[in-house]
């Protein structure tokens, strides 16, 4: 082989261009049924019998990834040298200030949502009860139905206007983003506004939805917005937040926002932190724990202060969108622990059943209804009609009971007003059992189910309520309205928990059914979402007492084990249905015998360190790859020695601002007018398309020195690596691209996130 060191730079560039003319296909190994890769499970989920379909793979291929790794280039290193201790403290202090504002804003949003929901629900029941008190059954139903339909119509209409990302809980999208997936517009202003308005209306409409999931999405969107503080539409890019405009810092603030949203929804700051750690965040640090806890406390305090601190009552113990009071009474005996374990078993079975039906229902919606706004609107209105009819007329099924028969001993919620029942069409002094559970808001229903008395409800109404709640929770999940699942699942769990508690109290005296309702709620939540520590802490924070800790822990752990035996959590299935390429913490066992050379793309497009503009334009026009290894020709022909990696967006910025020169390439060329601040500012924006750049012949013959801008510390692996170890690098370091080199440091392949599925 002849030496290439003495060739002119233009000839060496042409040689590299010819060597790299073939564009790698990141899916070339997926179509070969005989390949080692295809013979194993191609998905990171735990179910052994699942494989991604070609359509699912293609959808995942079209989804881009985020850049969590630091771009350690020459500009960045020079900036590090200029950074003093004072500037570092300023950036750190700025993060705490952002957290403070994030907590206050999310707390204010939670307060506004609760106040508006109370207003709308109050108006609905005010007009409905006007006809109920006059014995006008038909008029009362039509009023009840009409208002519910109006709220659902407006809620669904808001989703149609704002986009599908404003519907449901938004947790799958948040999990995907925090895992490294770029879900476009999921945290944009339109999705945020649509989510808030749709949530207020859907939660007021009587549908079996809750506020906690959307609040997590809302908190994440606020965290993303306030940390970036920019507007591409208005061309607003203040330099004050420049150092935070990167995917890594944005990811941290989204994690904080997700925790803050839950903390504001439940008034549970510790539960919010644990939720972000256990469920949504894929990357965590000790510093992030401190900031998340601080922000959650600020959000919970802000909501609480606005709800109670401004008013006449000085009490500050009852917080959140959902509040259940507190008790210091010890309400169970250790001989009942076996019964609590049984509740965990039932919660796991019902949770797995819920996930199973939810999967198939959403699959049917995806195939039949698609994204058709008219069909989606019709479905939401139809579900509202059926829900209103059942909740209204089910209250007539059972006979009325005398209010005087209820003996209030005490309650999980000590506020005695929580046990006030709904009279509905019953005579004075009597109440409707199902009406007290179905004809009202979920907060009141849960308070009544948690009340400490065994003669408030009889067994048949509790059974009917549990079945109705489960059925409509399944049906309402996935509608084109904003709504979560925590509260509906708590209602289902409280229903079967109290039913079980009152059943065994027929044979064993001194059984407190209220604690069974509480434990049942925790078991049902763990059964469908498979969280453990987070749920235990949330339930303890809701009741403001640790006396329920042992039974809740038992029920939650058993419920998770039972549910995991049948399927995964509902959020993982939803991510799969939405084709969000989520990397689990560990690869499937079936990939243990796969090498990285089996999945890597071997014909890689590479760039020289000093690249001609003409070559760059041709390469960018001929493919849509998002990163290119940068090489330096070795002493022999065809050698491609790895030097670094550069992103497509960064190349577009360099081309747009004409960072050109016509030197020999012997010295590193650094444009003084394109410093670190300029480079960071421009790369934080959406890059201009190549089609809008017009170059003359002089510019096309010029060169760009990529060395100051490429990431020279990018992670690489040898072609002898196993798939499992490469997977761990992607998962633990938040990588987007991973060049593969041989023993001579030559680029022989490329692996992306999409190659892991």
From Swiss-Prot:
Indicate the segments forming the CBS domain, all copies: 600-667, 710-757
Q: What does this protein do?
A: Voltage-gated chloride channel. Chloride channels may have several functions including the regulation of cell volume, membrane potential stabilization and signal transduction.
Q: What is the lineage of its organism?
A: Eukaryota, Amoebozoa, Evosea, Eumycetozoa, Dictyostelia
Q: Under what name is this protein listed?
A: Chloride channel protein C
- The transmembrane segments are 97-117, 141-161, 196-216, 253-273, 292-312, 337-357, 378-398, 462-482, 484-504, 506-526, 535-555
Q: Does the keyword Chaperone apply?
A: no
Segments on the Cytoplasmic face: 1-96
Q: Which UniProt keywords apply?
A: CBS domain, Chloride, Chloride channel, Ion channel, Ion transport, Membrane, Repeat, Transmembrane, Transmembrane helix, Transport, Voltage-gated channel
The membrane topology noted for this protein in its Swiss-Prot or TrEMBL record is:
Multi-pass membrane protein
The entry's localization annotation reads: Membrane
Q: Which Pfam families match?
A: CBS (PF00571), Voltage_CLC (PF00654)
Instruction: Specify whether DNA-binding is a keyword of the entry.
Output: no
Using the UniProt record, give the first listed, main subcellular location: membrane
């Amino acid at each position: 082989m002849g030496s290439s060191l003495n060739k002119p730079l233009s000839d060496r560039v042409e040689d590299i261009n010819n060597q790299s003319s073939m564009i790698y296909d990141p899916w070339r190994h997926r179509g070969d049924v005989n390949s080692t890769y295809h013979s194993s499970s191609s998905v990171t989920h735990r179910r052994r019998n699942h494989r991604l379909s070609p359509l699912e793979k293609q959808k995942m291929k079209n989804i881009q990834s985020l850049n969590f790794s630091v771009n350690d280039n020459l500009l960045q290193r020079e900036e590090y040298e200029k950074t003093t201790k004072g500037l570092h403290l300023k950036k750190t202090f700025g993060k705490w200030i952002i957290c403070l504002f994030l907590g206050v804003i999310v707390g204010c949003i939670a307060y506004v949502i609760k106040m508006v929901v109370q207003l709308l629900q109050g108006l609905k029941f005010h007009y409905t009860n006007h006809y109920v008190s006059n014995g006008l059954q038909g008029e009362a139903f039509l009023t009840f139905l009409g208002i519910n339909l109006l709220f659902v119509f407006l809620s669904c209409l808001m989703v149609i206007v704002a986009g599908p990302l404003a519907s449901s809980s938004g947790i799958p999208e948040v999990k995907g983003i925090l895992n490294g997936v770029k879900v476009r517009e999921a945290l944009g202003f339109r999705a945020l506004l649509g989510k808030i308005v749709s949530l207020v209306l859907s939660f007021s409409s009587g549908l079996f939805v809750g506020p906690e999931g959307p609040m997590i999405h809302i908190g994440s969107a606020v965290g993303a917005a306030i940390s970036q503080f920019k507007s591409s539409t208005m061309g607003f890019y203040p330099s004050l937040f420049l150092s935070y405009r990167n995917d890594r810092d944005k990811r941290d603030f989204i994690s904080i926002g997700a925790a803050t949203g839950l903390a504001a929804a439940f008034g549970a700051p510790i539960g919010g932190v644990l939720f972000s750690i256990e469920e949504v965040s894929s990357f965590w640090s000790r510093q992030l724990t401190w900031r998340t806890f601080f922000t959650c406390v600020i959000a919970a305090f802000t909501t609480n202060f606005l709800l109670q601190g401004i008013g006449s009552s000085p009490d500050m113990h009852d917080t959140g969108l959902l509040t259940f009071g507190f008790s210091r009474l010890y309400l169970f005996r250790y001989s009942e622990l076996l019964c609590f374990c049984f509740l965990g078993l039932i919660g796991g079975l019902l949770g797995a059943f819920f996930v199973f039906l939810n999967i198939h229902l959403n699959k049917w919606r995806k195939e039949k209804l698609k994204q058709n706004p008219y069909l989606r609107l019709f479905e939401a209105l139809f579900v509202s009609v059926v829900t209103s009819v059942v909740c209204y007329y089910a209250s007539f099924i059972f006979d009325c009971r005398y209010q005087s028969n209820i003996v209030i001993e005490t309650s999980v919620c000590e506020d005695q007003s929580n046990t006030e029942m709904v009279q509905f069409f019953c005579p004075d002094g009597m109440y409707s059992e199902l009406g007290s559970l179905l004809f009202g808001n979920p907060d009141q229903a849960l308070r009544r189910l948690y009340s400490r008395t065994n003669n408030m409800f009889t067994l048949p109404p509790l059974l009917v309520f549990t079945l109705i709640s489960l059925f409509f929770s399944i049906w309402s999940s996935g509608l084109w309205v904003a709504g979560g699942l925590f509260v509906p699942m708590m209602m289902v769990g409280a229903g079967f928990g109290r039913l079980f508690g009152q059943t065994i109290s027929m044979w064993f005296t001194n059984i407190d059914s209220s604690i069974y309702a509480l434990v049942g709620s925790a078991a049902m939540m763990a059964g469908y979402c498979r969280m453990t520590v987070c749920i235990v802490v949330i339930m303890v924070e809701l009741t403001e007492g640790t006396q329920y800790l042992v039974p809740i822990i038992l029920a939650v752990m058993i419920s998770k084990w039972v549910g995991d035996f049948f399927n995964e959590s509902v959020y993982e299935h939803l991510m799969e249905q939405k084709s969000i390429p989520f990397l689990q913490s560990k690869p499937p066992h079936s990939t243990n015998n796969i090498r990285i050379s089996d999945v890597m793309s071997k014909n890689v497009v590479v760039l020289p360190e000093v690249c001609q503009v003409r070559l760059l334009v041709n390469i960018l026009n001929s493919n849509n790859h998002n990163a290119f290894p940068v090489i330096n020709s070795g002493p022999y022909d065809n050698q491609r020695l790895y030097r670094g990696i550069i992103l497509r967006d960064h190349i577009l910025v360099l081309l747009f601002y004409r960072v050109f020169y016509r030197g020999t390439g012997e010295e590193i060329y650094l444009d003084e007018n394109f410093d670190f601040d300029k480079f960071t500012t421009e790369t934080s924006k959406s890059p201009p398309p190549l089609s809008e750049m017009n170059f003359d012949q002089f510019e096309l013959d010029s060169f760009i020195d990529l060395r100051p801008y490429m990431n020279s510390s990018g992670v690489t692996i040898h072609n002898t690596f196993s798939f499992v170890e490469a997977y761990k690098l992607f998962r633990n370091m938040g990588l987007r691209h991973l060049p593969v080199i041989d023993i001579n440091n030559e680029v022989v392949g490329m692996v992306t996130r999409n190659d892991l599925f």
